[in-house]
């Protein structure tokens, strides 16, 4: 039995929303959970998962990007609020990225935001209800200084990473799942 992608996205959204509600940001958690794996709708990712899961015979594939599409979608959908969304989603398996390009550092966010074709290839495959805009309020409703913003992004990131892991555990091993 496999967990469908929508089941995982909604399950992760439910948990991330619950975690982020503890600091009055449930809607941010919900959006992060719903969008964090949208890139898995790509043909490349579906091929990758089939080969790496043993579902299809053949050699194993290398890694494939499944986070850039949602980071780009965040910039399109939330022009003034996109950075926290993009940072959290782009880094949910690897850690938070740097923004500016540094040739000594791989995986920075600015490079991911240039991959418009990733989003273009999957946009029509994403169920419309996952693309519905959620009303997001700025953190704590007022401007915050960079240190506060940094902490807030890390809190959201933690909500997403924990929710992603726990939703997978809930599906794979329900008897051991607990919050």
Predicted regions and their residues:
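Accessory nucleic-acid engagement/destabilization modules that flank
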Residues: 1-179
């Amino acid at each position: 039995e496999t967990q469908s992608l929508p089941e995982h996205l909604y399950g992760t959204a439910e948990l991330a929303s619950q975690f982020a509600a503890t600091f009055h940001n449930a809607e941010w958690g919900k959006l992060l959970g719903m969008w964090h794996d949208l890139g898995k709708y790509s043909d490349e990712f579906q091929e990758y998962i089939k080969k790496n899961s043993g579902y299809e015979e053949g050699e194993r594939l290398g890694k494939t990007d499944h986070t850039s599409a949602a980071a780009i979608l965040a910039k399109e959908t939330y022009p003034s609020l996109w950075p926290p969304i993009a940072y959290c989603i782009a880094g949910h398996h690897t850690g938070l990225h740097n923004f500016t390009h540094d040739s000594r550092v791989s995986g920075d966010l600015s490079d991911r935001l240039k991959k418009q074709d990733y989003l273009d290839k999957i946009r029509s495959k994403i169920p419309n209800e996952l693309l519905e805009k959620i009303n997001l309020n700025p953190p704590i409703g007022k401007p915050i200084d960079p240190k506060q913003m940094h902490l807030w992004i890390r809190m959201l990131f933690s909500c997403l990473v924990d929710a992603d892991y726990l939703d997978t555990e809930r599906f794979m091993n329900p008897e051991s799942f607990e919050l």
